[in-house]
Structures are given as structure tokens and as C-alpha cells.
Amino acid sequence: MDLDAIRAKVASGQYIVAFSHTEKLRRRRIRAQDIEEAVRLGAVIEDYPDDPRGASCLILGMAGRRPLHVVCGCLDAEEILIVTAYEPDPREWENDWKTRKKRF
């Protein structure tokens, strides 16, 4: 997915958060401003072009000093879908928050 296009849509408010995850975001204390900042400053670390729900990607960004993973998908030409956002779990991610730990 095109990060510049995602950033432009998020910056202009052309995004929605998946209804099924709004409560999870509230419990995780992740605000819309946190998502916007993470996308604005972040980088795509994984691409999911074959996602059955439609092409999506995983963005790593910072909200203040807090690392966030934001999963974005394409709804249509008008809006970006924020599928979910979460703090990466150190048991699953290396210290760079970009690299998944190897499972044995």
C-alpha cells in the first residue's frame, strides 16, 4: 500500500476505525490522535496484499514515546480503514518493534 496516500487520507480525516475494534482501542488507551501521529511518523513494516478483507498493511509509528502498530486497509478511493492499533508485545517483537521474533 502507498504510505503517502495513507498519510494524506489520515491527515485529512478520511479514515474510519473498524467498529469491531473501537472498544479494544478504548481499553488500550489509544486515541485517534495517537493513530494519526503514528501513521504520520511511521513506516510500513509488513504488507498484506492478499488479505481476504482487502489489501492492508502494518505501520510502525510512535505516539509520543509509545510505539504503536497500526493496521490499515483500503475501503475505497475515499477512505482508509483503521483495522486495529496496538502496542507491540515485546514477547512477539524484537526491540526495534519491526521484526517478529522467530518461533521455534
Model-derived features with residue positions:
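Ribonuclease/tRNase effector modules and their secretory precursors
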Residues: 1-104
